[in-house]
Amino acid sequence: MNLETLRQERRKWLTWKNIVPYQEAIKALPEYDDVEVSLGDVVDIQIADLSHKDAEQIRETALLMKPWRKGPFRINDLFIDSEWQSQIKYNLLEPHFDLKGKVVGDIGCNNGYYLFRMLSQKPEKLIGFDPSAIYYSQFRFLEHFIKSDIVYELLGVEHVEFYEHKFDTLFCLGVLYHRSDPVAMLKSLFKGLNKGGELILDTFMIDGEGEMCLTPRDRYSKIPNIYFVPTVNALKNWCLRAGFESVEVLEIMKTDLNEQRKTEWIDTQSLEDFLDPDDPEKTVEGYPAPKRVYIKAIKKA
């Protein structure tokens, strides 16, 4: 697969009618020399001596790019209160990985929140994959101030195995249930890892000891493209069949209204609207409410 040809084709996405305003707004932003970035729960960008005019321009640019799914971010006094409190997931996972000096990929990286957080561990390379011109634009907006060495590819999980180099650690958070062939996806990730490499993944799950999965008829939690929601044992089997040597369950956690909620930065429905109003243990379709399993799968050294 010729990824460079694909890159050139996908750069044309940035000329789409709905995306051009984002690109123009980013280009119009002033350059700032004195910027301090803190990579905590809130990715905090502080620009010295920011004028009221510039602050307003930054605010209007951020508002233009709604919805903001992942975050939160702060730019001086502007707080981007994203739909997801992404620090909850990151802080849950961080004790389970060491990225120093490693080549790291984040599949389905959205606007780069996790990538920015990972900078503090000083990996050798950080590469994000997400075939979304909107999320890429949000990343470029933030990167205008942060100026990191992160590479953002408008590519998907199916391209990882063909990438120019392999990875020591791959993150794939909230992607697997969107794929109609989860084992094929896991095989692609497996091929993209170096020997001894690790995959850190989360996905929706259902309770039970059996090796089975829920297959929604149409939608799950109002999401149309959810194909398989496995038990933990079924997920382990998928990973082993994809070639991984071992699978460790890091955490199981129900998604709650603190982690995912509607804010002024999304203008759409959120988790509260996806659950049965009479029984929050179920989705509006009658399925078990969203619960996630977090795993680490290891490729044999």
UniProtKB/Swiss-Prot annotation:
Its EC number is 2.5.1.-. CDD domains: AdoMet_MTases. InterPro entries: CmoB (IPR010017), Mo5U34_MeTrfas-like (IPR027555), SAM-dependent_MTases_sf (IPR029063). Carboxy-S-adenosyl-L-methionine binds at residues 70, 84, 89, 108, 130-132, 157-158, 177, 292. Keywords: Transferase, tRNA processing. It catalyses: carboxy-S-adenosyl-L-methionine + 5-hydroxyuridine(34) in tRNA = 5-carboxymethoxyuridine(34) in tRNA + S-adenosyl-L-homocysteine + H(+). The keyword Transferase applies. GO terms for biological process: tRNA wobble uridine modification. It comes from the Bacteria. The keyword tRNA processing applies. Catalyzes carboxymethyl transfer from carboxy-S-adenosyl-L-methionine (Cx-SAM) to 5-hydroxyuridine (ho5U) to form 5-carboxymethoxyuridine (cmo5U) at position 34 in tRNAs. Homotetramer. This is tRNA U34 carboxymethyltransferase. It comes from Sulfurovum sp. (strain NBC37-1). The lineage of its organism: Bacteria, Pseudomonadati, Campylobacterota, Epsilonproteobacteria, Campylobacterales. The gene is cmoB.
